[in-house]
Amino acid sequence: MTKVRFAPSPTGKLHVGNVRTAIFNYLFARKAGGTFVLRIDDTDVERSTKAYEDGIRADLTWLGISWDETFKQSDRFDRYEAAAETLKAKGLLYPCYETGEDLDRKRRLQMANGRPPVYDRAALDLTDAEKAGFEAEGRKPHWRFKLSGNPVQWDDMVRGHVSIETSSLSDPILIREDGSFLYTLPSVLDDIESEITHIIRGEDHTTNSGAQIEIFEALGGKAPIFGHQALLVGADGGKLSKRTGSLGIADLRDVDGLEPMAIMSLLARIGTSDPVEAFADVEGILEGFDLGKLSRSPARFDDEELKRVNAKLLHAMPYDVAQPKLAVLGADKGEAVWEAVRPNLETLADAKAWAVLIDGPVTPVIEEPDYAAAAAQHLPAGELDGDSWSVWTNALKEATGRKGKQLFMPLRLMLTGEARGPEMAVLLPLIGRDKVLKRLAGEAA
């Protein structure tokens, strides 16, 4: 059975970059009828917080991304220790005593001599006496995994055939001087023991995957099938990194007031061969989802495109779907008002502002008192309905000789105080005769 995982670190908030990876994994699992695992990568005890973890879970839930299994790496340190001992016993995990300054000096020297800054494996030649000497100085070792030096190859679901020359890589550090684990070993062991079948992640992990495949094999596991998607860039092709704060899922929800399906719709489609569409539910996205459609070129994320998708969703949203959301905002004025204001919405919160045009109080903008008086005089008798606007404006056209913008714009300003907004033919009966007459008389109503 297909089994994938999304493995965020609770050291920060979810943003469009990493949540796109969550979306791809979620859609891939659902399309295959498989299992989606949420793994919390909290081995960095100093920086990981419960607040960030709770935020990650809340953001995913709000987006409609549900998980079938979940666990935290901090509950599995004993398993990582055992795996490290296995690698040590095989001679594949070796201690190194260089300080950060030592390694920087080596890298600078290599680069000055035109060589790639690859770790020279000097630690493999240390004698027991030399190691003891370092220990006596108070140095603690960090531990590196010994790569084979052979090419590692796989067929990537996005990038096609990939070959990584491990001879050109530094042996990766798996354990820090303080005994804490870096990302690599816990991730591999978790993937083995969780029986993950596919790993879908950013292309910045491609080289790292070459090293990880050797660790999979060293621990007696079989490497999953990999798919490395291109990273997100800004609309101008520049990096998003400086803006990840403003592109956090929580901010897009709480500050910008965007709909979850707008974010899902955009992130699932940019960087693919399919056009961006506004999907009302995940089923719509699933129908055409295929990792094979992903481009190897960076996907451009455009804030304005996200807003357009959000607006399209709202313009097509039925009242029964909108009603609970409107109620939370204190903007539920009934189906008739929703139908009137819906075509003008960019965010759901806009509904509250547009509803004020109906409920009032509105301060009318009257630049031509004589025209206001004529408008009041020719307002159709009786209860206003869907035909009243047409009847009214035709009568005014006949009486004043006005037409086009000169006829309509002053009426909009007098009745709404705004130069733009929902259709007046729809608004007029909702405002009602009494408030219309008061506003035409210059009263706030």
Swiss-Prot record:
Cross-referenced SUPFAM superfamilies = An anticodon-binding domain of class I aminoacyl-tRNA synthetases, Nucleotidylyl transferase
- Per the annotation, the residue ranges of the short sequence motif 'HIGH' region are 8-18
Q: Name one GO biological process term.
A: glutamyl-tRNA aminoacylation
Q: What is its EC number?
A: 6.1.1.17
Q: Which reaction does it catalyse?
A: tRNA(Glu) + L-glutamate + ATP = L-glutamyl-tRNA(Glu) + AMP + diphosphate
**A molecular function (GO) term:** tRNA binding
Q: Record's InterPro entries? A: aa-tRNA-synth_I_cd-bd, aa-tRNA-synth_I_codon-bd_sub2, aa-tRNA-synth_I_CS, aa_tRNA-synth_I_cd-bd_sf, Glu-tRNA-ligase_bac/mito, Glu/Gln-tRNA-synth, Glu/Gln-tRNA-synth_Ib_cat-dom, GluQ/Sye
Principal localization?
Answer: cytoplasm
Instruction: Report the domain of life of the source organism.
Output: Bacteria
Tell me where in or outside the cell this protein is found. Cytoplasm
Keyword match Transferase: no
* One cellular-component annotation, GO: cytoplasm
Binding residues for ATP? K242
Q: Which of UniProt's keywords are assigned here?
A: Aminoacyl-tRNA synthetase, ATP-binding, Cytoplasm, Ligase, Nucleotide-binding, Protein biosynthesis
Q: Where is this motif: 'KMSKS' region?
A: 239-243
Q: How does it assemble?
A: Monomer.
The record's section on HAMAP family has:
Glu_tRNA_synth_type1 (MF_00022)
- Would you identify the family this protein belongs to, as annotated? Belongs to the class-I aminoacyl-tRNA synthetase family. Glutamate--tRNA ligase type 1 subfamily.
The protein's job, in short, is:
Catalyzes the attachment of glutamate to tRNA(Glu) in a two-step reaction: glutamate is first activated by ATP to form Glu-AMP and then transferred to the acceptor end of tRNA(Glu).
Q: What is this protein called?
A: Glutamate--tRNA ligase 1
